[in-house]
Regions:
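TRNA-recognition modules of translation machinery and tRNA-sensing kinases, especially anticodon-binding
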Residues: 1-159
């Protein structure tokens, strides 16, 4: 078996290790195209937090956008059945404007999305995977959880 660690750059190894981690926890790989219809992002501007999105008109006249976000593509393509949890991992490029120089950048993102009828187990698993993801990248990390419901639950359990 080939030792790919010798030929992969450190960021490529990290992506490979992260996707392997997510796969071991049962997350299905999600892959989408580089663009979506602009309307998806226009309806969800507050979620995206972007004031500018790269757009173009395709050959059939539809206004399209280079993806500024992966989550919305996953949500759009997920089943919405009651009682079902959709767990996806992804490694994809998004296109966002830089805060520093206001130019657009292609950014590689790797992560997970857990969508649907989510319970306590799913929330704990996502937090666990956040910790394991950070450990994969570096031993020097801080995990900041700012959801008040989770923080209250942790405080209640620790008290």
């Amino acid at each position: 078996m080939k030792d790919y660690n010798k030929i992969l750059k450190s960021d490529e190894r990290a992506v490979f290790d992260l996707l392997d981690l997510y796969s071991r926890y049962g997350y299905s790989r999600f892959k989408s195209g580089k663009f979506e219809e602009y309307e998806l992002y226009a309806r969800n501007r507050d979620f995206i937090g972007q004031d500018a999105i790269l757009t173009f008109t395709d050959s059939s006249g539809r206004l399209m956008a280079l993806k500024p976000d992966v989550t919305l593509s996953i949500a759009k393509n997920s089943s919405d059945e009651p009682g079902v949890v959709n767990s996806f991992s992804y490694n994809d490029y998004v296109y966002r404007r830089s805060r520093e120089d206001r130019t657009f950048r292609e950014i590689n993102q790797t992560g997970i999305e857990c969508i649907g009828d989510i319970g306590s187990y799913d929330i704990c698993e996502v937090i666990l995977l956040a910790v394991k993801s950070l450990e994969t990248i570096s031993s020097d990390y801080v995990l900041d959880i700012s959801h008040m419901g989770i923080v209250r639950g942790l405080i209640r359990e620790l008290a």
